[in-house]
């Protein structure tokens, strides 16, 4: 029983990735674990096409400024 419990604890730690890694959207539903030093998620407008804004998403150390941009620091906050 102790072996099973220890195994579950180890698997949980590995699956949770306790390294405080931030995860951001990069395109549509695609997600990326941000590298060290990039502790923000952002979504920023790069222009328009056929009357709709075109956005880029990803990890950042600093965010682009703009009225339609999103800059946040929790997992998957840049949808």
Swiss-Prot record:
InterPro entries: Snake_3FTx, Snake_toxin-like_sf, Toxin_cobra-type. GO terms for cellular component: extracellular region. It comes from the Eukaryota. GO terms for molecular function: toxin activity. Belongs to the three-finger toxin family. Short-chain subfamily. It is found in: Secreted. Its main location: secreted. Pfam families: Toxin_cobra-type (PF21947). Keywords: Disulfide bond, Secreted, Signal, Toxin. The keyword Disulfide bond applies. This is Three-finger toxin A2. This toxin has not been detected in venom. Expressed by the venom gland. The keyword Cell membrane does not apply. Residues 1-21 form the signal peptide. Disulfide bonds join 24-41, 34-59, 63-71, 72-77. The lineage of its organism: Eukaryota, Metazoa, Chordata, Craniata, Vertebrata.
């Amino acid at each position: 029983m102790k072996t099973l419990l220890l195994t579950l604890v180890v698997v949980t730690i590995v699956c949770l990735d306790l390294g405080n890694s931030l995860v951001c959207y990069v395109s549509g539903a695609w997600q990326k674990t941000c590298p060290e030093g990039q502790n923000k998620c952002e979504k920023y407008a790069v222009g328009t096409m056929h009357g709709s804004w075109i956005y880029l998403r990803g990890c950042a150390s600093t965010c682009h400024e703009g009225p339609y941009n999103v800059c946040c620091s929790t997992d998957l906050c840049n949808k």
